[in-house]
Every structure is written in C-alpha cells, then in structure tokens.
Amino acid sequence: MVCTSRVDHFQFLSSIVALCSWHIVVSMPEEGEKEQELNLPHSLRHLGECTFYDDGTAEGELPETVCCFDGVFYNYFSLGMDAQVAYGFHQLRGDKPFLASGPLSNKLIYAGYTCKQGWFFTQCISDPELRGLTNIIRLSIKKLDSSKWEHIPVPSSVRAIVALNLHNYASGRNPWGNLKPEYLEKKGFVVAQSDDGILEIFGLKQGWHASLVMVELISAKHIAQATAIRLEIKGGQWRDAYMQMDGEPWKQPLSTEYSTFVDIKRVPYPSLIINGADR
C-alpha cells in the first residue's frame, strides 16, 4: 500500500491548469476533382456536404454547395509559407525516411526547402504563389467581449499567418514575445494566456525575418487577438494553399471561381492538464 499525504494531493491539484482548445471547420467548394486531391492529416475528419452560413464577412461569390472537414487544435494553426515548408518535409520523410534520420539532417532538409520555395529570396521570384498572403486571404475576427465580425487587414509583407494558443511554436519558440504593458495598451492587447479564450494572430514576413523571430531577437508581426477567426481564401492564380495544425500540414486545393473558408472558434469547455514546470 502506498501512503500519500494531504500535502501531496494539494501539490498535485495546484499543478493542474486549464487549456483552451479550438474547433476548426474548413468549407471548400464541392468540386469532385479538388476533393480527390485532398489528403487530410489524422487530426481532421471529412464531414461531407454541409451548409455554409455567411455572417456578412464573405467578399467573393459563394457556391451552392460546400464540402466540409473539421478538427480540434490546442497549439496553433497556420497558413502560408511555413506550412508549405513543413508539407514538403513531411512528404519527403514519408517517401524517403532514410534521408530524415536525425536532428541535423532534418534541419538541413528544412533549410533546403525554405530556399527552394523562395522564402529567403522573394524578390528574385516572379511566381505569384510565392508572394504575400494579402493577395488571396481576407481575415475577419471577433474581439474579446464582441459578437461582431471585424475585418483586419493583413500586411502585404506577410507570407505566413499563425493563430497561436500556446507560447510554443516551432519547437518551443515564443514568436508573440513578452510584450511590455505600454505596447499592450497601445495595441489594445491583453497579456496572452493559454486559458483566456483568445488566439494571438501574427505574421512571418520571409525567411530572414522568421529566423530572427525563432531565435527571439525580434517578435513576429503582431496582427490581432481574437476569440473567433474566419479566413476567406480566394484562389485566382493560386491552385493550392498550404496549412498546418499542431504540426500536421496539408495541401488545400483552391477553386478559381469560389472562395474557401476557414472558421475557428473556441471549444466551450477547456481541457485540464498538469503543468510540468511545477513538478
């Protein structure tokens, strides 16, 4: 028999913290060929045909029917160049696992993909798929204590946009940063917490900017804080968009006629986890 004291129980209970989780729904035009191209990660499930409700945020023409899939994330969702690099790496690791055999080789492969896909040399590349996200996305959010959607402009320099719940992006980095009270007040932000029902939305401009952010010499491009997010993705010249959720990337086919929508809202009841820092 193992005996424990009341102090041990109190210590255990004091280390339990709440963690918000986020429900994501992707609504894409129902096109047979596009759906066949879609290879979803394990964290997402296919819902089939569903109804899309426009709250007045949509800018493009809406299709008659949409195909939906959904999932839940705890850490982050991202769209853009970082997800494209992650997708390329995951594809290579699946096809040729012997190449990704250790931390050093993984880092070299990642570096190769960032250069190949133009993250470091944007100005030298004319391919529209390698330009800023402002060309294809429209960002709408709901702020704290507000039920209305608000359009938020995405800076033209941003090539990856991230919605972050935990301060643990890309192997433990904190790209949002530890912001000073004066800056928080100026921007209308609050101190970021993992259980506050708020996502921090930031952008990464290009490889050099992302590299400095990852070593925490600078912060990412702060865009907004939100309790709900809607992204409208307009195809046009873009055939695909790259997304990832808690490290699982996928290639999202886009329609040339209709928009694809990503809706993110908080799961009503938070999860309970043990804070490892207290143990």
Language-model-detected regions and their locations in the chain:
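Catalytic core of DAGKc-family lipid kinases
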Residues: 1-169
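ATP/nucleoside-binding phosphotransfer catalytic cores, i.e., glycine-rich phosphate-binding loops
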Residues: 132, 136, 141-153, 163, ...
